[in-house]
Amino acid sequence: MDRLTIRGDRFIDSAGRQVLLRGVNLGGDCKVPYPDGGTNHPSDFADHRDVSFIGRPFPLAEADEHFGRLKSWGMNCLRLLTTWEAVEHAGPGKYDTAYLDYFAEVARKAGDYG
């Protein structure tokens, strides 16, 4: 998608056409670890510092399928959700850099689809 500008109350593309944003929230399940949420198994529930959110909203191997489908439905806007627990679940100042790398790759792939 081209860079948009604002004219009055409208989004305008580089050709001067009005653009209607059609989009979705992606990642409604982002608040729980992957794959099973880590809260529905008694053995996992207490170990909140040793979880992974890599795979939320979906595994990278499935990204093309999901983004292609959204584009085919006419979506041109995406709100990619995450939660702070995914970034700092191990404790204050302990960032999950593997998750941040995963999330950056999901965002990059989304950009490939406009």
Question: Where are these predicted regions, by residue range?
Answer:
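Active-site-proximal flexible loops/turns
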Residues: 20, 30, 88
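N-terminal module-boundary/linker segments of secreted carbohydrate-active enzymes
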Residues: 1-21
